[in-house]
Amino acid sequence: MFDIYDYSPRLVALGLIAATIIIYSFTLTVYRLFFHPLARIPGPKLCAITGWYEIFWDVLVGGQFTFKIEEWHKTYGPVMRIGPNEVHFNDPDFYNELYPTIGATYEKPAQWRWRFGCGTAIFDTIGHEHHAQRKAPVAAFFSRQKILQFSGFIQDQTDILVKRIRDDHRGQVICANEAFDALTMDIIGYYAFGLSYNSLQYPGFKAPYRNVTADIARMVHVGAHFPWVFTILNALPEKYITRLLPPMSKIFMFRKEISSQIRRIKDNKEYLDKNVNEHRTVFHEILNSNQPACELNEGRIYHEALSLVGAALETSKRTTALAVYYILATPGVEDNLRAELTAAMPDKTKNLSVPELEALPYLNAVIKEALRLAIGVSQRMRRYSPTETITYKDYTIPPNTVFGMCHWEQLRDARIWDRPTEFLPERWLAEQPLALNGQPLNKYFVPFHRGPRMCLGKEFGMAQLNIGLATLFRQDDIKLELYETDRKDVDVVADFFVPLTVKESQGVRVLVK
């Protein structure tokens, strides 16, 4: 016979703790399934019970939760509970209501603030008003007017890229991802810091920081769900971390470089004054703004630099490389594009301005299809309102509930897009392109998101795409041919906030003829 006095106080305490955990977990499960304000929203029960189901698909399996959401919507309908306190929508006509351009005061959930390790950057700012305050000086610098003024430099760097392809790589295989990565690094480096990294001068365009943004992205889910991991990594000596995780060496090098440039600009007032007329960079603009002192410290500006440069590199590189792939892989597209560019630029040495390029219908159609299939951000855009109720059909979403929609689904929805996974520039050539439901197609074209938090770099990215593709495919003495490259090198198989292809992919490789 067992006697309670035979058990030590330690065992009794452990038993009580275990019982408490079991009772608490059971009670919480019952509450979330039957009494929570979202209890009547359809969706997988495991998602309603715990956030660990998302962790399983994104951290353990690897960037798959977005695809599970798409799959579950086919079962549960257009509104679905995907977390204990999160709702996801899949209704293309609801997108503009959920992310209105004017009047929205939504905030970002704090949980995701440190997923990139730069939580004080504009992109991950939580509060609506705080976001608007930080955004103001930067938004002016990325306005259409500013980018058009800067477009001459974008053209100059693109000319360097094309010249290097022609003179140094004929008969060789190059990776378009690496070439456009180098191009973007030289452009954004000068725009942000007032210097060029000369990435285009490296043999084969294999610059030191190539693919660093993809390496950073692969840590995003760990950073989102376990932010303390970054705290530990930052506290450990780099030499030990790089031995365990070799890709981290490139990330550390990239972060040090960004930090040194911010320190140079911030501390060297003489440099700032000297270059203000030559090229006033985005960080000069921030540091000379009327922001509070706490917004101008080195740590926050460093976070802004990481966010800005990282976003520009990954999205521009992927979209342009994907465009090159489909131009070369889709019958008739290259011929149509070259014919239009030749007619518009009889003398290939006389480049067109960005507005003139934007007026070319086929080039514009190619760029739109590239943006649609590249999907700059593959993850849902989470928001919440502390005060507002969201109403969708007969469902009411209470304040402080996280909600969102995916670009991934919006840009590939078979209810909107004819043959959504195919590259079809022709869909944009009608005088008024229409969706399958009869609505204007542009209503559903959201590669840069919409609302107060839409992508700041839209004009920058569009200028680079127009200039890059027009300059490259106007050259009648350069012929590109895909080399051991197919759909696996562009198709998205994982969501790490940005879309990633299979790990084995070597990118879009082309033979220069």
Swiss-Prot record:
Which residues are glycosylated according to the annotation? Answer: N211, N351
Q: Name one GO cellular component term.
A: membrane
EC number(s) on file: 1.-.-.-
Highest taxon listed in the record's lineage: Eukaryota
Its transmembrane ranges are 11-31
| GO MF annotation, one | oxidoreductase activity, acting on paired donors, with incorporation or reduction of molecular oxygen
* Record key words, sorted: Glycoprotein, Heme, Iron, Membrane, Metal-binding, Monooxygenase, Oxidoreductase, Transmembrane, Transmembrane helix
Compartment(s) where it occurs, according to its Swiss-Prot or TrEMBL record: Membrane
The family database entries (PROSITE patterns) matched by this protein are listed as: CYTOCHROME_P450
InterPro entries, per the entry: Cyt_P450, Cyt_P450_CS, Cyt_P450_E_grp-I, Cyt_P450_sf, Cytochrome_P450_monoxygenase
UniProt name for this protein: Cytochrome P450 monooxygenase orf3
The organism is: Eupenicillium brefeldianum (Penicillium brefeldianum)
What gene codes for this chain?
A: orf3
